[in-house]
Swiss-Prot record:
Record CDD domains: PAS
Ranges where the record places region Acetyltransferase: 1104-1278
Gene that encodes it: Ncoa3
SMART domains per UniProt: DUF1518, HLH, PAS
PTM summary: Acetylated by CREBBP. Acetylation occurs in the RID domain, and disrupts the interaction with nuclear receptors and regulates its function.
Protein name: Nuclear receptor coactivator 3
Region of interest (Interaction with CREBBP), residue spans: 949-1113
Domain bHLH, first and last residues per copy: 26-83
Organism of origin: Mus musculus
Region Disordered, annotated ranges: 1-25, 396-512, 530-611, 625-668, 697-724, 748-788, 805-839, 891-1054, 1296-1323
GO cellular component terms listed in the entry, alphabetical order: cytoplasm; nucleoplasm; nucleus; RNA polymerase II transcription regulator complex
Polar residues compositional bias, start-end: 396-406, 428-438, 543-561, 572-584, 701-719, 750-770
Motif (LXXLL motif 3): 1041-1045
Amino acid sequence: MSGLGESSLDPLAAESRKRKLPCDAPGQGLVYSGEKWRREQESKYIEELAELISANLSDIDNFNVKPDKCAILKETVRQIRQIKEQGKTISSDDDVQKADVSSTGQGVIDKDSLGPLLLQALDGFLFVVNRDGNIVFVSENVTQYLQYKQEDLVNTSVYSILHEPRRKDFLNTYQNPQLMEFLGLMRTRDKKAPYILIVRMLMKTHDILEDVNASPETRQRYETMQCFALSQPRAMLEEGEDLQCCMICVARRVTAPFPSSPESFITRHDLSGKVVNIDTNSLRSSMRPGFEDIIRRCIQRFFSLNDGQSWSQKRHYQEAYVHGHAETPVYRFSLADGTIVSAQTKSKLFRNPVTNDRHGFISTHFLQREQNGYRPNPIPQDKGIRPPAAGCGVSMSPNQNVQMMGSRTYGVPDPSNTGQMGGARYGASSSVASLTPGQSLQSPSSYQNSSYGLSMSSPPHGSPGLGPNQQNIMISPRNRGSPKMASHQFSPAAGAHSPMGPSGNTGSHSFSSSSLSALQAISEGVGTSLLSTLSSPGPKLDNSPNMNISQPSKVSGQDSKSPLGLYCEQNPVESSVCQSNSRDPQVKKESKESSGEVSETPRGPLESKGHKKLLQLLTCSSDDRGHSSLTNSPLDPNCKDSSVSVTSPSGVSSSTSGTVSSTSNVHGSLLQEKHRILHKLLQNGNSPAEVAKITAEATGKDTSSTASCGEGTTRQEQLSPKKKENNALLRYLLDRDDPSDVLAKELQPQADSGDSKLSQCSCSTNPSSGQEKDPKIKTETNDEVSGDLDNLDAILGDLTSSDFYNNPTNGGHPGAKQQMFAGPSSLGLRSPQPVQSVRPPYNRAVSLDSPVSVGSGPPVKNVSAFPGLPKQPILAGNPRMMDSQENYGANMGPNRNVPVNPTSSPGDWGLANSRASRMEPLASSPLGRTGADYSATLPRPAMGGSVPTLPLRSNRLPGARPSLQQQQQQQQQQQQQQQQQQQQQQQMLQMRTGEIPMGMGVNPYSPAVQSNQPGSWPEGMLSMEQGPHGSQNRPLLRNSLDDLLGPPSNAEGQSDERALLDQLHTFLSNTDATGLEEIDRALGIPELVNQGQALESKQDVFQGQEAAVMMDQKAALYGQTYPAQGPPLQGGFNLQGQSPSFNSMMGQISQQGSFPLQGMHPRAGLVRPRTNTPKQLRMQLQQRLQGQQFLNQSRQALEMKMENPAGTAVMRPMMPQAFFNAQMAAQQKRELMSHHLQQQRMAMMMSQPQPQAFSPPPNVTASPSMDGVLAGSAMPQAPPQQFPYPANYGMGQPPEPAFGRGSSPPSAMMSSRMGPSQNAMVQHPQPTPMYQPSDMKGWPSGNLARNGSFPQQQFAPQGNPAAYNMVHMNSSGGHLGQMAMTPMPMSGMPMGPDQKYC
């Protein structure tokens, strides 16, 4: 078998191989059908054989054949099968090969169509030039490029279509002899290297008349073409044919009109060219914004060209009608945002496919947006300013205007009008040359889209312009970009990069984070002009529309009628709003006066301000930067005066610095930038200690300067690195994750004197201050400043204790506080300066930096500068702080100038107008805001001593009333009594003079409030802890208890305070109602309550809020941020200048709501409600005690630490939330029942599921006994509520954190007003609070309103956010604030009179 198998199979295999040979050469035999038939037969044979063998394989296996033989057989069969498969494949390929691929097959592309296709692919046309230079052939598509027809060019000279300047080159290359030589070279050189020439070819004009009438430029239009020249093909020449030598050229456009995929849309037109249809699908699908605008503008531009121009849409369609297609040259237009768009339209004639009649045109418009990002537009040297020669300062004549090139920039040519105003928004072209020698002047700001160019040299409105020779002095690096950093579009530095930009006349901060620029400038050792004084206000309210910060420039005993005037206080706001009061003639006059004074002030204070500005810039929130370009830059005219009174070299600086308050949500990137700047400082050789010192100096130096300003010896307080941990600030800034911290915002890295070069925007503006500063200003040694620092520490302690800035280091140690609080000092507390100063010069509202005038209370940096007033220093008794707070309120409004107090005169508390110096009005205001009155009213502790917070009336309060002052005094007395009592009972009250907790602690906008901040003060935070927004529920004014019990500046103090509070709580808890009443009587609370009620009735709606007054005041400070709406818009400070849109109470509330939402500490801004003080005192005490316990118990209690980023836990036990005594508790219980019912009804009425919010079980307040909850837990819970609810909901009554605000409505006073069942706190938590029963009038309604503003908090205390779904209801049901304002029949809940007035 084996033999048989071998002999039989092998021959078959051999035969198959032989037969396969033809297959191996498919090119030959396969052509014939016979070969094909033979192959098919072979395939069949092989297939049959394979099947036969495979069928017998099983039998073969049984044969007695050696295994190797079987394997061979199997392998043979496998090969046969492969051959069969290959045969099938080859046979299937034969047909294709024969038809299409074989050399005999027909070509795929017709030769006639190949040429045009190639030309189309090349995007060019072909022409052939003979040795005489004549065109012997040109392709038909030349019409698309040169508008010439084929017959127009054939047999014409190629030179006729070449641009004259290029003809010579062409002639030199292609003259006959050279052409021949060239062609000869082409024969010898590689054909792959064609000769390439760029030429401009003439395009045909459309009609003779146009040629005759138009100018040569119009008649002759050229298209730049790239020519690829080749000699005649060698093959043609070698064939011996007598062909004339010629050159073949392909000309193509140099660059395609739209290299990248352009946007496009299609329009259909009738034969007359009218638009019939617009197809936007392609544009819409591109997902690019503003496609409607681009279509509208493109069509408008397309149809706008007239026949008199090189082309028109009419001619375009005529050409399309004749030729069937046409295309326009590239044309351009700009979009609304200034983006330049290049467009080209190609049209085709549309015919009816059946009748071939012309029906119309289809036009495709190709659009290409040009990259118009920040492209520095070199300023023509003949225009604007030329870069100064190296070494020369740029002296710009006042008349030199740099017009901003930015698409949106508005050049203000009039130097008198513009000048240094360039405040944040005025991107006066910082283009003013950078002062640094050799640096060419770049005016990136000129490109700032939003910046408004002010003439660089023009003096600030109110301030005398710098003489050309002076201009170098005032340059603040901040205005300029840091030298190496191109100024950001919105960067204040928009102008020259050099740190010392020309006297910051250009306030080009347009909207950039000047802080970064300043830091960079510092890190880079940018200019050293301290004159520019970095006082550029880092945080400028500028952005906050309403925040006017009036700063009495002239601190020394002068009543600055317009703080602006004195301070030149063109508030940064002014610059941003263009409202600066300084613009007013009075302001100018005042600024001039102050400028006279400026010379008196030493340069040090100014420098310190500059540093503060830097620190502020560094730390200011992104929002602040973005909105308020930090400050008026040197442009601020105010700067001048400010130097005197405020000491901020740039008068504005302090004012501006105070203002940066816009809240920005873009913190991460800013924070990173800040970190980079700090790291750069370190890398540049600055030790951490030096950096810390710089920042400390920046923030704290000026404090005392104001006070001494009158003396003409303003001292800069420099935080002594010795006193502070040098690295503390730096570490804090680098480690801090919450860019929203107000403190951080305020802490502006201020360069040390060297760094002050950066002088933030405010510095350079004041020529006078700058000039005078130079020689006179000197920084005092740390030792010299220590006294001031102590004062400042006292104030800073308060600030730190406030949620503003938790600084564990603040400890009790003033130095540490200052360093930690460099920011606070920037807050405006420079040095407390003897708090008792006769008349606290009000800080320029804006300038947190401005030092307090002599004898003035430490100027609290206007928190207003910070978003929100959270900061408002509650330095009790510090009128300045109060002022700033009010300024906050005033500034909060979109119009900073609008007086915040609806009732008060501008001079009054609210002076919304920065110009109205609070100081003056104070003198006359019933509240006696005058410094003297203030002093009297506010017991001012010695330096560092804390003054019990005087509940200042919020700007919003209807009118300053003398009675309020009395109440304040009474409250202060009560506070003191309580302190004594507490000390006696628990020795709890360990008031650290520097530690008065500032209610302002919460970042105005930081939801986390300070809670996010590494909680130096978990407890201090409590006082501020209102809620993310600074405990909206808490009275804006800090409760006196809070002041007394104010969280210590350091963690240690906090723990001590907690222990004391726990003890006190235990004591009070164990005390029966009778004992509590005795304590109340001992404190004089009953009388205060009675008075408070009377006052409340007087207070209008405010009084109802009086407990809320604290809140209201804060609100005032916060201004009607929302008025009714809760959206906590920082920028939306509803024209704080404006009176609250709703009732003042509501306005306040809304303000509070908004700011609290901002994470501001309600308390921060407010002093305390005057009328509610008694209630507040006692309730606060209880609340704080219970609150702490509750916080421990409550899941919502956010550890009382600033840590809580959300600030939900912001409410801290410290918060004076309504506290109920036993009687009140009983009343509350009764009320709870009714309120629960009412709430349920409310819930049913409201679109949102309020039942949950109000259902007793959910409501912590409801389910737990009201008193228990209210007393302790309610407050802590409130915080969670704050942010959960919509901003507007905050306005809603339902949220009404009855406890928020620390108004402690539950106090006896509250209960008396509320009535047994109307405990405001209880009610507020309940939906019914929205429409509190008329019984609740007075206090409750006020509370309600406030609650509306801070509903989250107030409810939050209840502890169940859901419980306060009412607040959420606000969002669904509309603004609760509005509801509160309009008495709605809520389950029979009559609104209190106060509310009714809302």
